[in-house]
């Protein structure tokens, strides 16, 4: 006898979701034939890395997730600090120059990344269109052969 509509919620251990996300990402990236064996090898390699470097990705992920959901820094708005106008004037030009340089550098990098991504997307779409045309040509040729056989 089963209960079709249950309000039971299971608590997932902290970091477990991050481990499964990492495994899923690697499975999608590698496309293995034997997923359980791949998962075992993946978790074993994570254990080896944890022993060698004393870095636990599950623990790190749980801390990041906890910080994300429990960060109360932006709930209260602080008034801007008042300082001497002379100090502000001397500090602003240097900061503006640095900020503009980093913005330009990042925008150039972003443009390059966008161009590479656009080329990949266009190539994938062209490949898709070409495959559809080949599929259509095959079905047309099969239909023509069937018509010739029926005559």
From Swiss-Prot:
<dbReference type="InterPro" id="IPR000048">
    <property type="entry name" value="IQ_motif_EF-hand-BS"/>
</dbReference>
<feature type="region of interest" description="Disordered">
    <location>
        <begin position="130"/>
        <end position="151"/>
    </location>
</feature>
<protein>
    <recommendedName>
        <fullName>Sperm surface protein Sp17</fullName>
    </recommendedName>
</protein>
<dbReference type="InterPro" id="IPR047579">
    <property type="entry name" value="DD_CABYR_SP17"/>
</dbReference>
<dbReference type="Pfam" id="PF02197">
    <property type="entry name" value="RIIa"/>
</dbReference>
<keyword id="KW-0472">Membrane</keyword>
<comment type="function">
    <text>Sperm surface zona pellucida binding protein. Helps to bind spermatozoa to the zona pellucida with high affinity. Might function in binding zona pellucida and carbohydrates.</text>
</comment>
<comment type="subunit">
    <text>Homodimer. May interact with ROPN1.</text>
</comment>
<feature type="domain" description="IQ">
    <location>
        <begin position="114"/>
        <end position="143"/>
    </location>
</feature>
<feature type="compositionally biased region" description="Basic and acidic residues">
    <location>
        <begin position="68"/>
        <end position="98"/>
    </location>
</feature>
<dbReference type="GO" id="GO:0005516">
    <property type="term" value="F:calmodulin binding"/>
</dbReference>
<dbReference type="GO" id="GO:0007339">
    <property type="term" value="P:binding of sperm to zona pellucida"/>
</dbReference>
<dbReference type="InterPro" id="IPR003117">
    <property type="entry name" value="cAMP_dep_PK_reg_su_I/II_a/b"/>
</dbReference>
<feature type="region of interest" description="Disordered">
    <location>
        <begin position="68"/>
        <end position="115"/>
    </location>
</feature>
<dbReference type="GO" id="GO:0016020">
    <property type="term" value="C:membrane"/>
</dbReference>
<dbReference type="InterPro" id="IPR012105">
    <property type="entry name" value="Sp17"/>
</dbReference>
<dbReference type="Pfam" id="PF00612">
    <property type="entry name" value="IQ"/>
</dbReference>
